[in-house]
Amino acid sequence: MKTMLLFPGQGSQYIGMGKDVYENYKYAKKAFMQVNKELNTDLTNLIFNGTEEELKKSYNTQPSLMIVSIAIYLALKEEYVDKLDELNICGVAGHSLGEYSALCASGCLSISETAKILSARGNEMFKCADNNTGMLAVIGSDNKTIQENINSIKPKCLVIANSNSIGQTVVSGYLEDIEKFKIQMEGKAKRLIPLPVSGAFHSPLMQKAQDNIKNEIEKLDIKNPKYPILQNYSGEFETEISSIKTNLQKQITAPVLWCENMQNAIQQGFDTFIEIGAKNVLTGLMKRIVTEEQKEKIKIINIENVENIKTLFDKINND
C-alpha cells in the first residue's frame, strides 16, 4: 500500500461541515478554536450556523475548508494513534487552496499560520474578483478541443483554469468571452455549466492578487515536510522549501492540472487515495481519472464525518 492524502478546494464547502467531528474529537475541537483565535472571529459559528452566502466569500471559504480538513486529519490521528502508520502515507496533495491544507497536514505550517495566510489569500482573491468575470465547467470534451475553441474566438482573456478529470475542464475569464466560447462549443461538449463564483480564478486576471500575496508567502516559516507535496503549479513532488514557496506564489494565476497530477501519482506507484474534507469532489474526480484496468488495483476513499473515520480500515480491507 502506498497512500496519498487529498485535500479539497473551493466549491466543497457547506454549512455544518465538520460539526460531528468537532463534537466528538478533542484535538479537532481545539484546532477550530485555534483558528477562531488567530483570525479574531468566530469562524466556527459561521461554518456550523452561518449562511451559504457568507461562507462562499473566499476570505471565509478558504480558512473554513482548511480547518475542516485539518480537524478530520487530527481526528484520524486521535482515533487510530499509531495505527495510522499502516496506511504508509507517502505524499499529499490539495486542489488549489487545498494545497495549504496539505502543507499543514505535512507539518510545513502550523494551523494558525495556515489560517492566517489563507484568510489573506482569500481576501486578495475576493478583492480581485470582478462581476464581469467568471468560470465555466465544460463536461464531455477534451483540453485540445477546448483550447482550439478558445483560440478561435480571440478572447480578451479566457484560459483553461482547472483540468479536473477525463472529460471535466473549467475555463476562466471575462463573461463576454465565456458567452462567445459557449456558442463556439455547441455540439462539442455534453454540458456547459456556469460556476457560482464571482471571479476568474486561476487566470491572468488574478495577477494583482498574486502580486499582493507574494510577500506574505515569502515570509512564511515553512518547515521541512513530513510527506512530499504534489504541487498544483509544478506537477511534481516537492520537498524543498524554496520550491514550495515559489509554486504557492505562482498558483493563483496558473491552471490546476489536477487530472495530470493524479495520473503522475498513479505512475509513481500510489494505489490508495484518501480525500480528507468536506464532500467528496476529489473522490469523484479520481474515479473518473483512473482507467478501467487501474480500478481493480486502486482504492479511493473519502472521509468527511465520524462514521467515515471509524470505518476507514474496514473500507481499506474490504474494498
Please provide the spans of the model-predicted regions.
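FabD-like malonyl-/acyl-CoA
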Residues: M1-E148, T272-Q294, I298-I309
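Alpha/beta catalytic cores of group-transfer enzymes, especially the acyltransferase/condensing modules
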Residues: Q10-S12, L39, S106-T253
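Non-catalytic peripheral regions of patatin-like phospholipases
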Residues: S69, K214-I217, T239-W258, K297, ...
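Short hydrophobic/charged patches on amphipathic alpha-helices used for structural packing
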Residues: C259-Q263
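Non-catalytic positions within long, well-ordered alpha-helices that form the structural scaffold/packing
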Residues: I266-Q267
